[in-house]
């Protein structure tokens, strides 16, 4: 079997944890500065919009993003592992993960358009191709 397609999936899992830690490391000090008495009872992350600095919230926005579209990536990789995959699939998986990590860093640290949108569109296009590859592998 070609290079392991599970490796880029595992890298994205670890990257998601890195973003969780980055989010916590920036939100914690921001919340201490704000004072939790300013939060409504049962407040959630989205309730922090406008209360803590935008650049702190960007990390949370990206963490949430990593729990959305990448679920399709994980499903496609799983299907390919079960149905068979080739070097192109592994390359696409790595490309998707690399672009998603670059997108994460950009969104969390800079968050300017159009670069962020371009990174998202590129990763989405790669994911769409990988999803079609997964479908074809099942036929």
Residues covered by each model-derived region:
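Juxtamembrane helix-break-helix junctions at the cytosolic face
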Residues: 77-89
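Interfacial loop-to-transmembrane junctions
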Residues: 102-126
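Short membrane-interface loop/juxtamembrane segments of multi-pass integral membrane proteins
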Residues: 43-66
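Hydrophobic transmembrane alpha-helices of multi-pass small-molecule transporters
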Residues: 17-20, 101-104, 128-131
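Core segments of transmembrane alpha-helices
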Residues: 65-77
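N-terminal signal-anchor transmembrane alpha helix
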Residues: 3-44
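Juxtamembrane boundary at the C-terminal end of a transmembrane helix
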Residues: 130-139
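Structural signature of hydrophobic alpha-helical transmembrane segments
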Residues: 87-97
């Amino acid at each position: 079997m070609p290079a392991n397609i599970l490796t880029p999936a595992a890298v994205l899992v670890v990257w998601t944890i890195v973003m969780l830690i980055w989010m916590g490391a920036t939100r914690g000090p921001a919340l201490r500065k704000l004072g939790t008495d300013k939060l409504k009872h049962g407040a959630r992350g989205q309730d922090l919009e406008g209360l803590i600095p935008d650049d702190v919230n960007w990390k949370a926005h990206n963490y949430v993003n990593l729990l959305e579209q990448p679920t399709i990536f994980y499903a496609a990789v799983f299907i390919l592992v079960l149905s068979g995959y080739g070097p192109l699939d592994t390359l696409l998986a790595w490309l998707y993960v690399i672009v998603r990590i670059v997108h994460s860093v950009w969104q969390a640290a800079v968050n300017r358009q159009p670069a962020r949108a371009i990174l998202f569109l590129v990763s989405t296009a790669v994911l769409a191709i990988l999803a079609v590859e997964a479908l074809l592998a099942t036929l």
